[in-house]
Amino acid sequence: MEEKNGWNIYMVTMKNGNIYTGISNNVLKRFDTHCNGKGAKCLRGKGPLKLSWFSKANYSHGEAASLEYTIKKQTKKVKLQIIKLNVLDVKTFLNGKMK
C-alpha cells in the first residue's frame, strides 16, 4: 500500500531561544496543540512559542521523519539558517550542508 504525501516538517522557537523540530500532516493544528500545552512535553511551559518555519513540500511520513531526524542533528546555526532563508527545499539544502 502506497502512503499518501502530506507530511511537513516544522520548527518552533521557545522563549529561551531553543528550537524544537517536529512533523505533522496539519502544521497549524499541531502548533495550536503545542501552544495549548497538549503537544510535546518538552515545549510545555516554554512559551510563548513561535512557529518559525515549516516545509512547503509535502513528504511521505517516512521522508518527513527522516528529514526531522536529520534536522534535529544539525547545529542551532544551521537551523537558524533554514528559518532565516525560509528554505523551500530542505532536503537539497541539507544535502549541500553535509558535503
Curated annotation (Swiss-Prot):
InterPro entries: GIY-YIG_endonuc, GIY-YIG_endonuc_sf, UPF0213_domain. This is Putative GIY-YIG domain-containing protein 242L. Pfam families: GIY-YIG (PF01541). Residues 5-81 form the GIY-YIG domain. SUPFAM superfamilies: GIY-YIG endonuclease. CDD domains: GIY-YIG_UPF0213.
